[in-house]
Amino acid sequence: MHGRPRNASKPEEEAASAAKAVQLRSLQSQFMTNHHDKIYTNEAIELSTKLLEINPEAYTAWNYRKLAVEDRLARIEPDPNLVSAILDEELRVVESALRQNFKSYGAWHHRKWVLSKGHSSVGNELRLLEKFQKLDSRNFHAWNYRRFVVELTNRSEQDELQYTDDMINNNFSNYSAWHNRSVLLSSLLAQNADGFMPNIKIPEEYDFVHSAIFTEPDDQSGWFYHLWLLDQTLNVETPLLTSSWPSHGSSIILSGAGCLSGSSSMFTTFCSESGSFPLILYFDQAVGGVSSSTVTIDSELKGNEGLVWEPIPNKNSQVSCVWVARLKYVSSDPCEYKVKIRVGNSPGIVSSRGYNFNAPYEFVFTAHVHDTVEDSQEGIVSWTDGFDIWDAKSKDLNSLVTLDRLNAEMDFKWRQEAIDSEVECFGILPDSKIGKLTLARLLMAREAMVSDDAVKGVHYEEILQLYNDLMALDSSHYQYYKDEHSKAFLHKVTSSSESLSRHLLRYRDMNNLVCLRLNNLSLSRIASVEKLLFVQMLDLSHNELHSTEGLEAMQLLSCLNLSHNRIRSFSALDSLRHVKQLKVLDVSHNHIGKHSVDTTRYLCSSPLSNSELGQDDVGKQNPGLVTKYWDAYCVLTDLNLKQLDIAGNEIAGEEFSSFVLQVVPKLVWLDGQKKLGN
């Protein structure tokens, strides 16, 4: 184990091991009898002591001793000396067991339990820990127990931080000491303790960890701490609104279900059978408290008092990055309305980490309500024809600039300086896998903080090349680098209105839907969706995607092309269940049904048992098929599709096609063929 060769046992060692096993079986048999019969005599307790001296991992024996201690304490007078004597004996047994096996979970847990009784000297525990940590300075059990002991004392976190200094300077490879340092610093920084202001302390910590990284570059401990520091540098405590739809200054056209005959408007057109459209707020971190009291709406659109805001994707959750409310309109009442949204003017929006949203934002858009011209033709959506070039004057991309500039007003100066210093430092580091990865992360961090359009995006080519190098150097982590490469590429695409507009089109056959083409790019992950909330038609075909995670935020999405990817099951499409506007879905030529064992199926938010499946007519008529295709059933029943393509998958066939037509009754087109009766 851990690269150490296993040598054959000598005959005398095997004989000793066999004798120990016989003794252990005898002790275990006697012990279990005592435990079963609840015998807590001195002899029975001594027997458990002998058992634990041989096998400190006998967890049942530790539990037995807890019961025995409680029994003995209940039988004596409340004399502190007698209580201490009983508990001190337990500490002695634990210490003996730890000398046998320093990594015994049961022994450390039992010692915590004894100490929590409050009759033992905490000072003795710290002295004992120092002895143990000299034997094994990296043992995480001891460090975990140390944190527990320190909480029971008046020892300051600053003193403990100094202790980690000493342990790290003695051994840079002490991962547990680095971890404890991050725990202590997190607490001290959160308290704004004297001498622990982030803009001063974090740059100092970068200098501290450099000693470890450049002295022992092949050891991972310092690198992990550096990654933690980078996270602290990037994370702004106060949550920020990163995007919204509609965006500030935009105009949208609203109608009922159907078409706007001859519509050539460059405004975003939204057609809805329900007579409502989504308002989307996207925060940089999960927040709660988004409600009609914290987000106010001024509009002449009737029936929108007390709007209900829901978190996406989980309605049962109290926090999310994405919040959606639906604003009602009457398509039979054509008119133009100004809508003003104020976010955070009243307190109440709070991040999952407990920080208040204190960057109020106001945006105004115009809603043009039009009559609907019913279209009796249910034409098939083509992904090759009917597209027009993007109008550079469109205001749909306003939010890319507006909110970026607003958030740039936050105090990022010291953070930018820290990142710049690290980029300069690691830019001269000799080539190594971890060095290249760290430099790529630092350059991504620098891009995240840039607000000046003149310099924004200049590092992406270098970042992409670094991940290309890593994929070639380190095949065992290829998929991770591939995913990071995809995320960096999408950040590059969405970094400016100019770069994003190169991938945008209008689909004239459906009210000039906004179409984003990201096909044939070898993407394996979806990212930057906060910049794509206005997209209605998305082409992700001919990539290497395994799931649709992230697309749940794109509430306007009505057409999605995922053909020729690497999707292995319908559970990988689970996020689409929250995109209620989706009408056209192409998942042809994927790997659905190809793998007999697919663990991703269990990521799907499925019913707890088959008895909860198929309570509708389809489930009652075909319970066997619902059970067989339960993940497809769960996803498809939540969608309102009119066009679906599944050809080229292992699952495709007459049986599954028949099942789909029953599950999605409004489906008109299946694999390019029009459903009979339509």
From Swiss-Prot:
LRR repeats lie at residues 510-532, 533-554, 555-578, 580-604, 638-663. Keywords: Leucine-rich repeat, Prenyltransferase, Repeat, Transferase. GO terms for biological process: protein geranylgeranylation. Pfam families: LRR_6, PPTA. PFTA repeats lie at residues 40-74, 86-120, 121-155, 156-190, 201-235. It is an enzyme of class 2 (transferase). It catalyses: geranylgeranyl diphosphate + L-cysteinyl-[protein] = S-geranylgeranyl-L-cysteinyl-[protein] + diphosphate. One of its GO terms (molecular function) is Rab geranylgeranyltransferase activity. Its EC number is 2.5.1.60. GO terms for cellular component: Rab-protein geranylgeranyltransferase complex. The enzymatic reaction requires the aid of the Rab escort protein REP. Catalyzes the transfer of a geranylgeranyl moiety from geranylgeranyl diphosphate to both cysteines of Rab proteins with the C-terminal sequence -CCXX, CXXX, -XCCX and -XCXC, such as RABA1A, RABA2A, RABF2A and RABG2. In vitro, can prenylate PGGTI targets with the C-terminal Cys-aliphatic-aliphatic-X (CaaX) with leucine in the terminal position. Substrates with the C-terminal sequence -CSIL such as ARAC11/ROP1 or GG2/AGG2 are prenylated independently of REP and when the alpha subunit is associated with a beta subunit (RGTB1 or RGTB2). Belongs to the protein prenyltransferase subunit alpha family. PANTHER family: GERANYLGERANYL TRANSFERASE TYPE-2 SUBUNIT ALPHA, PROTEIN FARNESYLTRANSFERASE ALPHA SUBUNIT/RAB GERANYLGERANYL TRANSFERASE ALPHA SUBUNIT. Heterotrimer composed of the alpha subunit RGTA, the beta subunit RGTB and REP; within this trimer, RGTA and RGTB form the catalytic component, while REP mediates peptide substrate binding. This is Geranylgeranyl transferase type-2 subunit alpha 1. It comes from Arabidopsis thaliana. The gene is RGTA1.
